[in-house]
Amino acid sequence: MANRLKEKYTNEVIPALSEKFNYTTVMAVPKVEKIVLNMGVGDAVSNAKNLEKAAAELELISGQKPLITKAKKSIAGFRLREGVAIGAKVTLRGERMYEFLDKLVTVSLPRVRDFHGVPTKSFDGRGNYTLGVKEQLIFPEINFDDVDKVRGLDIVIVTTANTDEESRELLKGLGMPFAK
């Protein structure tokens, strides 16, 4: 069974983008390459249990086992040693990526308090979009009673677009609610 969002991309977004930006071939049309979810757990330095809980929540959200990230160098001000586990990340591609993006746009983002759309300034100049989520409770898989601490996470949507404008049109076509 093909994903709903992937079908929308194939049937609606590709023709619309081809018309707007005058692409000669279908392969020139930008597409979502991968989505990276990153959860930095600063208090994991003092208590390793916090990192385990964060990783478990990230696994629930993404449906994939996260990679534990380690500190690249020691920073005395943060009481941080090189090689200490300080976060978790997941890279989603293919079917899981489209499922996550669909869930993010239709279910999770509307659950954010005082939500007026995602900011349009979060493009990096190369067609990638970064979104910060303040609390993991907006995802339907997270049970409110099981959460010990509200944690945020970063969501990076990597596209094959060359410019921010192309990327914005791609994400808008896929249903991303940008602020007016």
UniProtKB/Swiss-Prot annotation:
Gene Ontology annotations for the cellular component aspect, listed alphabetically: ribonucleoprotein complex; ribosome
Pfam families noted in UniProt: Ribosomal_L5, Ribosomal_L5_C
GO annotation (BP), single: translation
Superkingdom: Bacteria
Transmembrane intervals: none
Signal peptide: none
Gene3D superfamilies to which the protein is assigned, alphabetical: 3.30.1440.10
Record-level Gene Ontology MF annotations: rRNA binding; structural constituent of ribosome; tRNA binding
Function of the molecule: This is one of the proteins that bind and probably mediate the attachment of the 5S RNA into the large ribosomal subunit, where it forms part of the central protuberance. In the 70S ribosome it contacts protein S13 of the 30S subunit (bridge B1b), connecting the 2 subunits; this bridge is implicated in subunit movement. Contacts the P site tRNA; the 5S rRNA and some of its associated proteins might help stabilize positioning of ribosome-bound tRNAs.
Recorded family membership: Belongs to the universal ribosomal protein uL5 family.
Protein's recorded name: Large ribosomal subunit protein uL5
Lineage: Bacteria, Bacillati, Bacillota, Bacilli, Lactobacillales
